[in-house]
Amino acid sequence: MEIETDVVSSTSGSAKVRLANTEILVGVKAELGEPSSGKPDKGRLEFFVDCSANATPEFEGRGGEDLALEISNMLTRAYDCPSCLDLGKLCVIKGQQCWVLYVDILLLECGGNLFDAASVAVKAALYNTWSLDNLCPRLYHGRCFWTPMSHSNCYSQSR
């Protein structure tokens, strides 16, 4: 297995995984957004999977849509577990603002083990995004900034 991180400069984090004849590219974009009404104290992860027609002829046309949905649903269930990723660390202001991580997964080559390779690629890209333990939300005049904890006292309400 080969894992490369920080391979797409226009993303917040990225990874490329090659497992035998399977190759997957993952990019993560982080944006501020609103938390879901059912989880006002947590951030959100949203997965999008694209099965490239170049990966296998079976993906031409609408051939890869069912597989893409299945992989997306599997990842959504896996990351809904607090021990996998603490989405509470993505909360900026409870009920108002959180980080939304958009995880885009592109299947470049399909040689089997798609679920395993996708899981590893997503985990590597999320770890490449940033370390949430080292960041702190700060509000100035209603705007949110994230700064390293070592450079500031952490607080979550504006003065």
Regions found by a protein language model. Name each.
Residues 1-159:
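Polyanion-binding surfaces on beta-sheet-dominated domains and ring/shell assemblies
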